[in-house]
Swiss-Prot record:
One of its GO terms (molecular function) is translation elongation factor activity. The gene is lepA. It is found in: Cell inner membrane. It comes from Cronobacter sakazakii (strain ATCC BAA-894). Keywords: Cell inner membrane, Cell membrane, GTP-binding, Hydrolase, Membrane, Nucleotide-binding, Protein biosynthesis. This is Elongation factor 4. GO terms for cellular component: plasma membrane. NCBIfam families: lepA (TIGR01393), small_GTP (TIGR00231). The lineage of its organism: Bacteria, Pseudomonadati, Pseudomonadota, Gammaproteobacteria, Enterobacterales.
Amino acid sequence: MKNIRNFSIIAHIDHGKSTLSDRIIQICGGLSDREMEAQVLDSMDLERERGITIKAQSVTLDYKASDGETYQLNFIDTPGHVDFSYEVSRSLAACEGALLVVDAGQGVEAQTLANCYTAIEMDLEVVPVLNKIDLPAADPERVAEEIEDIVGIDATDAVRCSAKTGVGVQDVLERLVRDIPPPEGDPDAPLQALIIDSWFDNYLGVVSLIRVKNGTLRKGDKVKVMSTGQTYNADRLGIFTPKQIDRTELKCGEVGWLVCAIKDILGAPVGDTLTLARNPAEKALPGFKKVKPQVYAGLFPVSSDDYESFRDALGKLSLNDASLFYEPESSTALGFGFRCGFLGLLHMEIIQERLEREYDLDLITTAPTVVYEVQMTNNEVVYVDSPSKLPPLNNIQELREPIAECHMLLPQEYLGNVITLCVEKRGVQTNMVYHGNQVALTYEIPMAEVVLDFFDRLKSTSRGYASLDYNFKRFQASNMVRVDVLINGERVDALALITHNDNAPYRGRELVEKMKDLIPRQQFDIAIQAAIGNHIIARSTVKQLRKNVLAKCYGGDVSRKKKLLQKQKEGKKRMKQVGNVELPQEAFLAILHVGKDGK
């Protein structure tokens, strides 16, 4: 056991986590050169296309160190995006140490900090690594100082390497083996194994990634899930070297995978503890704190026949992604679907794309909203996650919106632009610290503004140098209103949005103008209106298509023309009473982009 090392790799987006993992796998001979490819751990197509890591992946390797001993390294490659931070915290729970990878050109960024603090809170040994020293812009001395300044860990002798060229990766491994403590645990105690992650395989059922904390798990053992008390047979178990390799047992301190032929998706929840049925452990291991979704959106299948398969797909996906929340919802405009909760907009995009790809569904998404806290006039407090559920205005005593605490790190020269952006987003500055050339800014910004397009705008105003990390702070009373969209006098529930009173006329006008371009012209006028309660704040009209009834009149009496026009008018009026308007899919997406184009 003293030769086992469990560690994660944490870093900001694009600082080279996955490339470093590739090199480590190569040095330890986990894959032959023929099987090796770039970013071998990013196995999802989506991850390869976007060049980001979404799921944490684990690998077990054997490394022969310079002291002649052979060490077993279990390491987990983690995502860097703020939307997937729960993946990181789950991975860290299975480790004793973490490699903090920092780009020697870019320096410390917000995500580096956030993930590093998570690791320190969990009492992990953090080993700083300066990556990308082959770049002409690399300045390892300055970055080492920055790490000490901002993060507060000693980085004077931090390992320097270039994961791309492979320089110094050997030193990283040596340092790892030296600094990261071996796992603690009692191999003879009753089995306790933590479920770090699980996913659904069409042939095997539920596959779980587990970390054995105490005891030993052997093939054929009867295991019990502590939270539900159900027992299963351990049919197959083993490790990833990134390939799935079968083993006969997983010893104390090891990380591996387990198949118990669980067909029920809820059979082995993430964060649960497994133990042996005949000799159970006293108590479960502390799991993970549940993450609360920050953004909600409705997802509806385009054709209602897909509803069943959509429900199954969501179930399988939520097994793999513990932070996805969903409940059934129905809408008059879109039929039956689900209200889903996500950690952020990127998360929402990824989930939608995975559903469409992996399960072959066509989906419509409604505009994302955050959760509002509403105090009713009878002092009851309700939480509203969709504009259509907002109670009537006369029943609301106070409406509170969620405020996010945003930590930003950026170079000094972009400070002005970023502050302007934060103020425009109704932000309040709470802290500002200078670290050399970097500025650490803390703002409290309404969550609704953060999830809309704050991240994109922050990146564009700072030319990509600013980085952001945010978390939910509290609910705060605010003057929010619901803007309804009426089409020919009928409310369309899927198009409603909740916005701040000051922005309402502007958001309403913009939405109405956008919709006007998207709804195809009909044989009669279509009035598109935006309203707060019964007060109309904006209107535009999609003009009717009409035949020129006067084409056959040459000269002649004006009353003849009037008669024809009058007749046409009456026909259109009749048509308008019976006609209904088809809304194209783009109309629902229009809401997403309100307030984006250069405003």
